[in-house]
Amino acid sequence: MNVRGYEIYSYKSFPYDLYKGSPYYQKQKKKKDPVRYRCMLMAFDIETTRLPEIDQSVMYVWQAAVNTSVCVGRSWKEFKRFLNRLTEGMPDNGRIICFVHNLSYEFQFLRSVIKFDDESVFMPSGRKILRAVAGKIEFRCSYLQTNMSLDEFTHKYGVDYAKVHGFDYDALRFPWTPLTDEEMEYIVGDVIGLTQALAAEMHADGDTLNTLPLTSTGYVRRELKANMKEYPLYLLKKMQPPLYIFQMLNEAFRGGNCHANRYYSGDILENVHSVDRSSSYPAVEVIEEHYPMGPWKLET
């Protein structure tokens, strides 16, 4: 089957030999982690049907894009066989990065199907899953990496296969339900569009899979580190307050408070608008030319 110029394979017909010779990125300097990532852009997604009588969802189709090849299956057994064939012959420290837009959702299904390394499951907050490793596959959340919906992400980079709309989510579908060409176009569209957008993002930022930040804030940290290189480390260390002052600052800190104007307290007001300054503290530090910087001195 062919969708918009992309050949759609089953796990049996997928061209595994085409990717067996894929090279690996060189290990980054100063990194002790022996893992080497394969030069292969992969995305994964599932479609589910909600069963209200048992208040659960079931997967009726999965799809994975590997560079320009797309594999579609209807059962978890097929998915496991697909991963086994895809990683066959890889070295012990070899790994394939597989992006999932909103990994936290897919992880609820995957964790009962494949074995994850418990220590590899990285949750930055709450129940959000940023990264999880199963065998030689490293699943990463592209939603947390971009901080954008898939629709926003694909349109931002103007990819050929932007998110397709008009899909009927309410229709009951099962692994044995025949899928129309229009449904297949939607189903494979998300993984194709995701790989295209990720490739465009990396090209725009000069990244590879080896250097791509895990989260959207990773770009800011990277830029900050690059700009801070011009400041000698010993000067930065001199600016750090002594421990007892640091503890006092922590105890004195407050922020994010919302207060009522005492003249209007208890009244219901209409047509009210509000204005908020985002990231006010770091903005002041950057914008103000004479923001105080230097060693802490005790005045007696």
Model-assigned labels for residue ranges:
Residues 38-40, 91-96, 269-271:
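Short coil/turn segments at beta-strand junctions that form active-site/ligand-binding loops
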Residues 5-17, 21, 52, 172-174, ...:
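Common nucleic-acid-contacting/processivity interface regions adjacent to the catalytic cores
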Residues 31-63, 272, 279:
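Gly/Thr-rich phosphate-binding beta-strand-loop-beta motif of the actin/hexokinase/Hsp70
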Residues 68-179, 185-193:
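Conserved DEDDh/DEDDy metal-dependent 3′-5′ exonuclease domain
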Residues 4-7, 60-69, 98:
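Cross-family signature of deubiquitinases and ubiquitin-like deconjugating cysteine proteases
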Residues 1-42, 46:
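N-terminal accessory regions of nucleic-acid-interacting proteins
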Residues 57-61, 112-119, 285-298:
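Short secondary-structure boundary/capping segments
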Residues 45-49, 102-104, 108, 143, ...:
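Anionic group-transfer/hydrolysis microenvironments
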